[in-house]
């Protein structure tokens, strides 16, 4: 691995050059940084990553940028300027992982495609994230999150399921950048796999990851049942969770998830419904008598509406039915369990003030990650990183005069 500023965590010593923008690549690299990698974010001089300006912002920096760029260093370089491209390739020669998320062909036209970077660093793990991948009829289509939610099945599978098991006609988007973040999860896992392959002597490689592929892979197991089993009659919804609805209580909302037979019968008892009917006893009998089961479920919703949240949850927990309350992000931040496990960390940012973010969810016993560090200001580390390459202050100033840094 390359020499990098030591951060604690299992990826300590790994250096990542992050040329990506928005959410997919930046979030993938943030996950690597959480685990100890030294991530150098390369941004456009004077403007930076577009994510700095999207959504809720304070002090000129968005919440999205803070969340996707924690634990990183920021360098400004413009590969459109020959001098900027030359310095970027010098950095690439000293990195383990190179990440970009532009349309196929963009990096090649700039002279920083895989072949260019491999020429200076044969063992590099070069990661290309795009909407549809490098080939196929959609390869050169532009793609943001909602485009991939539409193509990948997310929007269609969010249609409302009616009591009779049919769905309405209106597709719905998941109200967050779900396609971006799912892709980022696959990317961070694939990067660590490629680093392992390199560590055991298989060399570097070019890793392509299409957002469409990531969403399809993520969705297929539990939301595309009739496409997995191609010979079914299609009488059941493809998603076995599509009929789940939250319970409205007198003073709030909650959920019960009666997946196992004992849980379903416990749900009935918790809300005073007779659980002895033979049509309710097993998955098979409930599937056979779906209309009757729908009536039973509507009864549980009616009973629940007259209970307080505390009373309803207590009744469900007494029957050991998996259940919970619906919390907003603000509620979660104050939840006693979240506080007890240190789910969120707060730090100060010179422009945005107090910033609160979740820690990495994996807690490593022998290689623990350190506390989160704040997202960088635009170009905050340009001088120090370029000095590490051997550039003196006059050379760095010259790059700025040229618009290269």
List the model feature ranges, each with a label:
Residues 46, 132-133, 211-216, 251-253, ...:
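Glycine-rich beta-alpha junction loops
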Residues 52-55, 225-234, 271, 335-349:
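Short, surface-exposed loop/helix-turn segments at secondary-structure junctions
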Residues 192-234:
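Substrate-binding/catalytic subdomain of NAD(P)-dependent oxidoreductase enzymes
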Residues 243-319, 323:
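Aromatic-enriched alpha-helical interface/lid elements that frame and gate functional surfaces
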Residues 317-338:
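Conserved PLP cofactor-binding pocket of PLP-dependent enzymes
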């Amino acid at each position: 691995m390359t020499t990098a500023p030591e951060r604690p965590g299992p990826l300590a010593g790994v250096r990542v050059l992050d040329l990506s923008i928005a959410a997919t690549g930046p979030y993938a690299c943030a996950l690597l940084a959480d685990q100890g990698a030294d991530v150098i974010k390369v941004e456009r001089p004077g403007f930076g990553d577009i994510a700095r300006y999207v959504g809720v912002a304070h002090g000129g920096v968005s919440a999205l940028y803070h969340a996707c760029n924690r634990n990183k260093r920021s360098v400004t370089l413009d590969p459109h300027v020959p001098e900027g491209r030359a310095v970027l390739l010098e950095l690439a020669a000293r990195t383990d992982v190179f990440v970009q998320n532009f349309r196929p062909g963009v990096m090649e036209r700039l002279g920083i495609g895989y072949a260019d970077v491999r020429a200076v660093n044969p063992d590099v793990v070069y990661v290309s994230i795009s909407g549809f991948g490098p080939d196929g009829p959609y390869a050169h289509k532009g793609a943001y999150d909602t485009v991939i939610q539409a193509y990948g099945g997310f929007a269609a599978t969010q249609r409302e399921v009616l009591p009779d098991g049919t769905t309405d006609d209106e597709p719905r988007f998941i109200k967050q950048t779900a396609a971006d973040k799912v892709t980022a999860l696959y990317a961070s896992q694939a990067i660590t796999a490629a680093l392992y392959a390199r560590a055991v002597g298989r060399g570097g490689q070019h890793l392509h990851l299409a957002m469409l592929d990531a969403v399809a892979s993520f969705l297929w197991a539990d939301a595309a049942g009739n496409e997995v089993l191609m010979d079914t009659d299609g009488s059941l919804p493809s998603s076995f969770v599509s009929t789940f609805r939250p319970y409205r209580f007198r003073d709030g909302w909650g959920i019960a998830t009666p997946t196992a037979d004992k849980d379903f019968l416990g749900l009935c008892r918790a809300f005073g419904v007779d659980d002895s009917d033979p049509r309710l006893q097993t998955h098979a009998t409930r599937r056979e008598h779906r209309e009757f089961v729908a009536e039973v479920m509507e009864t549980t919703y009616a009973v629940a509406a007259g209970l307080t949240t505390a009373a309803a949850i207590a009744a469900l927990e007494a029957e050991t039915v998996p259940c919970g309350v619906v919390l907003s992000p603000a509620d979660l931040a104050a939840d006693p369990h979240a506080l007890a496990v240190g789910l969120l960390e707060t730090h100060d940012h010179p422009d945005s003030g107090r910033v609160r973010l979740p820690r990495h969810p994996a807690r490593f016993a022998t290689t623990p990650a350190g506390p989160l560090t704040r997202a960088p200001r635009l170009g905050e580390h340009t001088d120090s990183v370029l000095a590490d390459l051997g550039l003196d202050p006059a050379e760095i100033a010259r790059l700025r005069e040229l618009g290269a840094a």
